[in-house]
Amino acid sequence: MNKKLTIEFDFKFDMIFADPPYFLSNGGISLQSGKVVCVNKGEWDKGKSQEDMMAFNMEWLRLCRDKLKDNGTIWISGTYHNIFSVANCLTELGYKILNVITWEKTNPPVNISCRYFKYSTEFVIWARKMQKVPHKFNYELMKELNEGKQMTDVWRMPAIGRWEKTCGKHPTQKPLRLLVRMILASTNQGDWILDPFSGSSTTGIAANLCGRRFAGLEKEEGFCKLSKARREEIENLNNQNILIGHIDDLHFLESSDMVREMPYGDEIPFH
């Protein structure tokens, strides 16, 4: 995350979602669609020493804290490879951890080694910027989404479906369902959301569908092109409706709460 890029934003954000490198690309293999595949994601995801990982996480979390409103919150996804480092950095920087969400995948990949339990979860830390400044939490909406019961910190959702790959896919792409729930839980209409590791801009697509505004940072040109294609795809109302039809949480919103004309790319040019 480049400090010079964050300076371009002369305002602060209501929410940040970050999907930083997990540093798990170590030459391992997995099974996908009946085929053995390598789990390496790219050079940016190759393992680091504990010291290097801590320094990396400390730097980008410090920059994010500077761009977050005092009542803002940040969501960070990870696995055991990086999530403990992230939690330590959050605490040292003065954030207050609110929850650690367990995302239980309903369609996890097969464990072909049969030497340990099958990995079926990822984690998402939810933290606020300040220790004593109240944060936004749309409690009643979350309760409504959960059939009138309190929403727990275990969310059962599938990984990305084919309907999310129509423009191509990112190797660590998160499902729209996951981002929509975070956004609905912690932001209001018109709020600004930042993703410092934007990838294919799933956060941006989810933000737009929920009526929020979005800015993302991404250094890989190929992923920027993929993001632009995905944004252009949902400028078509039929394509919007297809996505909305797959995301149960959006069915609870009034149609007036969802954006029909895309705001992201207006205030800040798309790069």
Residue ranges and their predicted role:
Residues 1-226, 270-271:
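Core catalytic lobe of class I
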Residues 1-6, 229-266:
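S-adenosyl-L-methionine
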